[in-house]
């Protein structure tokens, strides 16, 4: 009797503690508990840095030595004058260009969909602005170098330069897609490479959880109830994918990575959970995201900003409206208005006399755009701080639960 009462009292105690832990996790945010969240975040980062520093010093000391020698050699090249300086500066520009676009790709794919949407913020506008400038100037050789793109706190040199400084137009009517695509292809592929690299952390974390006999939280919660028609349908599709995820292979991963969709967030977790080979997952993700998906998005942006698409829309509208009674007589006037709007939109840069007003408008637009970017950065940083603090708190809660469970087990054994 005594043992039965103790056993029955053990379960409510653990269940109550779990409910309390869940409530504490939900309350731990920067808005509700900012000081506690920041404190746990700082502690978690400190422990993470200390653990990895100890690991690096103990296991890969040769790598640290090599990196130190490389950094010292690079610093020596930068500080010393000579004919090598221009080559070092050029190499620095290429390195900054590559790291910038790869970093934007990583920032876009990490966080299981909550990352920065850098295609909308940077790559998409860059391709659109370059295409519009190409259509205005009638030539594609606008860049001073491959790295002459949008970067942090730096605009490309061709953006505000008038078309007459580039020379006379090479293309009279329209610039073909095959000529525009190579000019923006490298930065697009680098961005796609970053998105593929951003899918690796979920894969490794899920694989480690699978090898230890655990299960990722994202796989457990994706089948939960969600309000809203779209959320329910997306969760149904995710549940279907999970039920068939043991059949994942190179081609299914490639298809999921190639098509822009919100479902690939779980691909890395599923492949890690079912212990798919790393190179099979990474190569399929790399080809799908850095080659196929990137080119689909880039070609779409170029076509939208290219007047060839406007010509096609105009011709299709004229063809369709010609069959509508009453519109045949109004088609010439409508066509003239459409062409006037297109020429006004794609006309070359205005004279220098009105350049001051344009720069003022550009400055205000840039200020608003930078404000939006900084707000998204702050939101992204807040999500990182909150998730890190919650993960650290959950680890402490699991240790507390394990201690309580072990204590209850010892008490039960003694009562026998």
From Swiss-Prot:
GO biological process terms, semicolon-separated: endomembrane system organization; vesicle-mediated transport
All ranges on the Cytoplasmic side of the membrane: 2-59, 124-249, 305-315, 386-416
Location (main, coarse): endoplasmic reticulum
Highest taxon of the lineage: Eukaryota
GO cellular component: endoplasmic reticulum; endoplasmic reticulum membrane
Bilayer-spanning residue ranges: 60-80, 101-123, 250-270, 282-304, 316-336, 365-385
Stretches of the chain found on the membrane's Lumenal side: 81-100, 271-281, 337-364
Entry protein name: Vacuole membrane protein KMS2
């Amino acid at each position: 009797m005594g043992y039965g009462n103790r056993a029955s009292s053990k379960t409510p105690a653990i269940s109550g503690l779990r409910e309390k832990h869940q409530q504490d996790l939900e309350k731990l945010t920067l808005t509700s508990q900012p000081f506690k969240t920041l404190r746990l975040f700082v502690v978690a980062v400190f422990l993470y840095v200390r653990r990895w520093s100890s690991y690096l010093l103990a296991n890969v000391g040769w790598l640290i030595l090599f990196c130190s020698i490389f950094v010292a050699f690079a610093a020596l090249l930068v500080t010393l004058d000579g004919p090598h300086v221009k080559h070092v500066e050029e190499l620095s520009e290429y390195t900054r260009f590559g790291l910038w676009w790869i970093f934007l790709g990583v920032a876009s794919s990490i966080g299981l969909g909550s990352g920065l949407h850098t295609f909308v913020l940077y790559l998409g506008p860059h391709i659109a602005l370059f295409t519009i400038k190409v259509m205005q100037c009638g030539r594609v050789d606008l860049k001073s170098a491959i790295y002459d793109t949008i970067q942090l706190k730096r605009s490309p040199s061709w953006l505000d330069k008038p078309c007459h400084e580039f020379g006379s137009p090479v293309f009279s009517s329209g610039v073909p897609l095959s000529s525009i695509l190579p000019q923006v292809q490298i930065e697009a592929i680098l961005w796609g490479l970053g998105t593929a690299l951003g899918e690796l952390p979920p894969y490794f974390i899920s694989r480690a959880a699978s090898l230890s006999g655990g299960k990722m939280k994202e796989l457990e919660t994706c089948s939960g109830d969600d309000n809203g028609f779209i959320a329910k349908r997306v969760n149904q599709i995710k549940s279907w994918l999970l039920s068939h995820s043991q059949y994942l292979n190179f081609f299914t991963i490639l298809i999921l990575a190639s098509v822009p969709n919100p479902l690939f967030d779980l691909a890395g977790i599923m492949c890690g959970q079912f212990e798919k080979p790393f190179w099979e997952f990474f190569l399929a993700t790399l080809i799908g995201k850095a080659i196929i998906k990137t080119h689909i998005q880039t070609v779409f942006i170029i076509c939208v900003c290219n007047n060839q698409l406007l010509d096609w829309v105009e011709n299709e509208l004229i063809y369709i409206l010609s069959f509508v009674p009453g519109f045949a007589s109004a088609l010439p006037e409508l066509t003239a208005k459409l062409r006037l709007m297109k020429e006004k939109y794609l006309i070359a840069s205005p004279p220098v006399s009105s350049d001051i007003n344009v720069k003022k408008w550009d400055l205000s637009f840039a200020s608003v755009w930078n404000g939006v970017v900084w707000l998204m950065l702050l939101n992204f940083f807040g999500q990182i701080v909150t998730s890190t603090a919650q993960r650290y708190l959950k680890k402490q809660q699991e240790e507390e639960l394990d201690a309580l469970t072990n204590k209850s087990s010892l008490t039960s054994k003694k009562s026998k």
